[in-house]
UniProtKB/Swiss-Prot annotation:
Assembly and binders: Heterodimer of HisH and HisF.
NCBIfam families: hisF (TIGR00735)
Keyword list, A-Z: Amino-acid biosynthesis, Cytoplasm, Histidine biosynthesis, Lyase
InterPro entries per the UniProt record, alphabetical: Aldolase_TIM, His_biosynth, HisF, IGPS_HisA/HisF, RibuloseP-bd_barrel
Organism: Pseudomonas entomophila (strain L48)
Task performed by this protein: IGPS catalyzes the conversion of PRFAR and glutamine to IGP, AICAR and glutamate. The HisF subunit catalyzes the cyclization activity that produces IGP and AICAR from PRFAR using the ammonia provided by the HisH subunit.
One matching Pfam family: His_biosynth
Lineage: Bacteria, Pseudomonadati, Pseudomonadota, Gammaproteobacteria, Pseudomonadales
Protein name (database record): Imidazole glycerol phosphate synthase subunit HisF
PANTHER family: IMIDAZOLE GLYCEROL PHOSPHATE SYNTHASE HISHF, IMIDAZOLE GLYCEROL PHOSPHATE SYNTHASE SUBUNIT HISF/H IGP SYNTHASE SUBUNIT HISF/H
Family (UniProt): Belongs to the HisA/HisF family.
Amino acid sequence: MALAKRIIPCLDVDNGRVVKGVKFENIRDAGDPVEIARRYNEQGADEITFLDITASVDGRDTTLHTVERMASQVFIPLTVGGGVRTVQDIRNLLNAGADKVSINTAAVFNPEFVGEAADRFGSQCIVVAIDAKKVSGPGEAPRWEIFTHGGRKPTGLDAVEWAKKMEGLGAGEILLTSMDQDGMKNGFDLGVTRAISDALGIPVIASGGVGNLQHLADGILEGHASAVLAASIFHFGEYTVPEAKAYMASRGIVVR
């Protein structure tokens, strides 16, 4: 039997408010994270991802208090990321109620941190977030590069090779965001999603660019992702999680 594919609403949190931008800029307020998380829990979301988007840039720690409040209201797996740099950061988030912790910038500066975290807490707790941007030109073999610091700093790292390295170090999941598509609402970058999903044995969560329900299904059917993540289409009431699940089921995708 095929494993059910997950639908994951994503809360990008900036100074305690859920926000949504386009290509990591032009931020728009979407509300209180705990209220929004509770709504998705009631709608039947499979998981929730909470990313403190100010954390890495400002060098401050993820808001543990918000995570505690959210975990007390939400009874589905909660992944939290943003500014996670140390084993103690991970322990604090898990103690606050996170089920999984997402590591992004710190993995690039210290890849062994991912291995240490997986050894300490188990691979099932460790998500590596990858922000990728296409860097190949027309007529060239497609190539995507890893960027850090909310998509501001190029690293020179090849996204597919990097994802393989993270899997080898013990990451349990990859959260893949296409920076070219983020907030654009014209679909995932299916090329990079498929390239990484096909190269790995661990689940890949597709993120960045969902504008309609067909895009969610495409992430699974064409991108070969194990889960699809979206923000704007849910936050601003365009679609509900049950509508998304019904549409995906109508396309032959197994959902919970």
